[in-house]
């Protein structure tokens, strides 16, 4: 493999350990004063506040950060899921000598607490006994404020995925508004975004050396508040949609370049010596001035423009700093940190984790731990660039892989030490199962590329697609003594896998437990192009290879595809076509996911602005169709569960509105059955018992006439005929929305019908009819 041009200034473990190293390694990082006393500590140097239960396992952020800082010689305490209603629980371990580290946990607290439909969840997988309500909404903000109440002079550093994805002015789905950077609202001293090992270690050592937090402003992967740019940095003004321009230095009013008065003194002639300085890279010491918080809140196009810039500045090899005004100050976002090397990754995962929850939880189960206790993280990062996912903005595009030896040692440690191990490793993976050791083969391209995805619309020719390192790892792992099975539970990137069929054969032959999950997300080009996902051709090719190799291995195995409904760019006809594809392929999904607009994702920008940040943004640029209303989002979700009888009335109504009545019935190509006689009788019964209507005469009530009956004719006049081409069910619904006037005309009835159809939010576009369905046994878990 070629040597990367993206190199750190110093190794993660090259710092002189802090003096407290003499205390040694703690069995568990202390969560109480009693534990501190046992360790002989009079105080903590650093206290980590987290919204998750403390599990000493490398899949939990607080454990990695805590053990990493402990390895640098610092005394680290943890306050897990504190009582946030007052400051007292935040003073449990006393005042830290250096700083508080605040994180909401492994998940965004709002996503953890609410569903995609903004409904309150009643469980929390990161809490003992799966209890909900153990962390507040916007936990990062609340915890930070309580830390400042407890010890106002102690620096507060924000971290974790919640803070990371809120490092800039961002759209907040739950309040349906644009919020300021979380560092502003939390009144914190610094925000660490992404994986925090490198910046946290540097900041901790600089604070320990006596520097003030206000003087530490230039650390990569951090966000700070400033009134001016960093000294020596030049800026590019991108506050408007026109071509960005350089921010010129303010001229010296005293004219320092003007000639000075001199007496006629002869100066000896000297021959100049020319020394050519190294030409600086165009991104070095350069920042981009973004539209202010106030502007992006008021102008959706500027918001999309800002989002596009931020996503272009994620490559640590060439990213520029970003600067955005909030009121009378600016947030300063330093470029991303240099990724960890394989040796550094090995050292981080070799730290002395106990791999079990803290003893204070007793036997209370923690579902998130139960899910991962026998799994192993083999890499970080993802270059897929899916629009609805924020992994690139958090972990980066560059894959950071552990060595094979490091992974094998962890498997042996699980086998020998973790209670309850039965010989089955539940996962060898990461953000994606099959990106292990796959990096850009061109050092120059890796350093300078600003593409959002290395695999969309086509796989970059510089990208390595040789899966042999992964295959070798799988073979070595399953040959270990005491290991019965190695399963792969992480999602497989199938467009990469088809480039190396050997991997698919290895996977199907040895590492699938009956079902393999993959995520095509949709079948139609419209939404797929906005998601930046490959077309169904790659899926079909992968399925053919998977089925072939499964059959050769004598195994009955199935693919479980995952889909997203109501994603920006999805029209109703797209969801109907997806439902027909599911029916044709005999899939019946048990659980479906509506699009969830999480902070900083490109898809969230589309959802909020109606603009496409994947292309150049201006006031005339592409408008994106966004399914927003509750009714349309429910419809899209219902189409994924076309087989559920509870959804049939809604689907029938929508199909009629779209002019797709031919999809209602008992024929093979139909999506939903026609209403039964009992359902029709129930509908008529409901009409007869609707609420009475008041006339203009007070206290006099009368029933509306059934809407499918012509109004009574006046004496000597012929009753008007109502022309209505819709079905009886739709006509009934439409006519109920007309006024209570008993002499409603045919024109009024027709108008009401059109209005009712317009409220459904559906599109009257043609839908491809499916061919005869396959007889596979695929089904959803």
Swiss-Prot record:
PROSITE patterns listed in its UniProt record: RADICAL_SAM (PS51918)
Biased composition (Polar residues): 696-708
SMART domains: Elp3
Record InterPro entries: Elp3/MiaA/NifB-like_rSAM, Methylthiotransferase_CS, rSAM, rSAM_horseshoe, UPF0313, UPF0313_C, UPF0313_N
Any Pfam family hit: Radical_SAM
Keyword Aminoacyl-tRNA synthetase: no
Domain of life assignment: Bacteria
Keywords annotated in UniProt: 4Fe-4S, Iron, Iron-sulfur, Metal-binding, S-adenosyl-L-methionine
Biased composition (Low complexity): 726-750
GO molecular function ontology, one term from the record: catalytic activity
UniProt region (Disordered), positions on chain: 681-781
Residues covered by the Radical SAM core domain: 368-646
PANTHER family: UPF0313 PROTEIN YGIQ
NCBIfam families: SAM_YgiQ
Similarity-based family: Belongs to the UPF0313 family.
This protein's name: Putative UPF0313 protein YPO0674/y3502/YP_2990
């Amino acid at each position: 493999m070629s040597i990367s041009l993206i190199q750190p200034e110093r190794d993660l473990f090259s710092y002189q350990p802090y003096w407290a190293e003499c205390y040694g390694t703690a069995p568990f990082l202390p969560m109480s004063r009693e534990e501190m006393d046992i360790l002989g500590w009079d105080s903590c140097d650093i206290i980590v506040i987290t919204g998750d239960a403390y599990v000493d396992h490398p899949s939990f952020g607080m454990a990695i950060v805590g053990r990493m800082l402990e390895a640098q010689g610092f005394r680290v305490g943890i306050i897990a899921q504190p009582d946030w209603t007052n400051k007292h629980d935040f003073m449990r371990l006393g005042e830290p000598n250096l700083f508080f580290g605040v994180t909401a946990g492994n998940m965004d607290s709002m996503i953890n607490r609410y569903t995609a439909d903004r409904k309150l969840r009643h469980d929390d997988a990161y809490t003992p006994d799966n209890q909900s309500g153990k962390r507040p909404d916007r936990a990062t903000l609340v915890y930070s404020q309580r830390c400042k109440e407890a010890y106002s002079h102690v620096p507060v550093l924000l971290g974790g995925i919640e803070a990371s994805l809120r490092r800039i002015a961002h759209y907040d789905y739950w309040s349906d508004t644009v919020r300021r950077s979380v560092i502003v609202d939390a009144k914190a001293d610094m925000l660490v975004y992404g994986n925090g090992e490198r910046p946290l270690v540097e900041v901790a050592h600089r604070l320990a050396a006596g520097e003030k937090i206000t003087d530490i402003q230039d650390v990569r992967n951090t966000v700070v508040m400033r009134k001016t740019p960093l000294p020596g940095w030049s800026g590019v003004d991108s506050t408007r949609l026109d071509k960005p321009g350089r921010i010129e230095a303010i001229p010296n009013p005293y004219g320092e370049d003007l000639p000075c008065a001199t007496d006629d003194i002869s100066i000896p002639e000297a021959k100049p010596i020319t020394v050519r300085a190294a030409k600086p890279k165009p991104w070095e010491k350069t920042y981009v001035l973004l539209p202010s918080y106030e502007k992006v809140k008021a102008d959706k196009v500027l918001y999309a423009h800002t989002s596009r810039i931020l996503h272009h500045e994620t490559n640590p090899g060439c990213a520029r700093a970003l600067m955005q005004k909030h009121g009378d100050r600016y947030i300063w976002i330093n470029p991303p940190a240099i990724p960890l090397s394989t040796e550094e990754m090995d050292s981080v995962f070799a730290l002395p984790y106990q791999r079990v929850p803290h003893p204070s939880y007793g036997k209370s189960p923690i579902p998130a731990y139960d899910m991962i206790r026998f799994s192993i993280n083999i890499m970080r990062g993802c270059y897929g660039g899916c629009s609805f996912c924020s992994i690139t903005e958090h972990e980066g595009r560059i894959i950071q892989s552990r060595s094979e030896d490091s992974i094998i040692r962890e498997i042996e440690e699980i086998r020998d030490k973790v209670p309850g191990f039965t010989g089955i490793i539940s996962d060898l993976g990461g953000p994606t199962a099959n990106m292990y050791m796959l990096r850009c083969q061109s050092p120059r391209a890796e350093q300078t590329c600003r593409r959002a995805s290395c695999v969309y619309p086509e796989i970059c020719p510089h990208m390595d697609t040789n899966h042999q390192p992964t295959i070798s790892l799988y073979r070595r792992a399953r040959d270990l003594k005491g290991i019965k099975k190695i399963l792969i539970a992480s999602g497989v990137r199938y467009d990469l896998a088809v480039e190396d069929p050997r991997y698919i054969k290895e996977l199907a032959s040895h590492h699938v437990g009956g079902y393999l999950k993959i995520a095509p997300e949709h079948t139609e080009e419209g939404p797929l192009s906005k998601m930046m996902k490959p077309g169904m051709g790659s899926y079909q090719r992968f399925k053919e290879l998977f089925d072939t190799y499964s059959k050769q291995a004598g195994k009955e195995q199935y693919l479980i595809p995952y889909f997203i409904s109501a994603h920006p760019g999805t029209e109703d006809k797209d969801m109907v076509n997806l439902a027909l594809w599911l029916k044709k392929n005999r899939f019946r999904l048990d659980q479906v996911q509506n699009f969830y607009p999480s902070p900083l994702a490109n898809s969230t920008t589309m959802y909020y602005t109606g603009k496409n940040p994947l292309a150049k943004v201006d006031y005339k640029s592409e408008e994106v169709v966004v399914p927003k209303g509750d009714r349309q989002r429910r419809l899209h979700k219902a189409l994924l569960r076309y087989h559920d009888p509870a959804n049939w009335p809604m689907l029938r109504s929508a199909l009629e509105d779209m002019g797709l009545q031919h999809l209602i019935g008992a024929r093979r190509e139909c999506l939903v059955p026609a209403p039964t006689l009992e359902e029709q009788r129930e509908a008529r019964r409901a009409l007869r018992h609707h609420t009475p209507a008041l006339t203009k005469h007070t206290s006099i009530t009368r029933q509306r006439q059934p809407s499918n009956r012509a109004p009574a004719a006046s004496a000597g006049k012929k009753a008007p005929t109502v022309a209505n081409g819709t079905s009886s069910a739709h006509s009934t619904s439409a006519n109920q929305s007309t006024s209570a006037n008993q002499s409603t005309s045919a024109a009024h009835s027709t108008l009401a019908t059109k209005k009712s159809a317009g409220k459904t939010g559906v599109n009257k576009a043609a839908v491809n009819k499916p061919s005869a369905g396959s007889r596979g046994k695929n089904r959803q878990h």
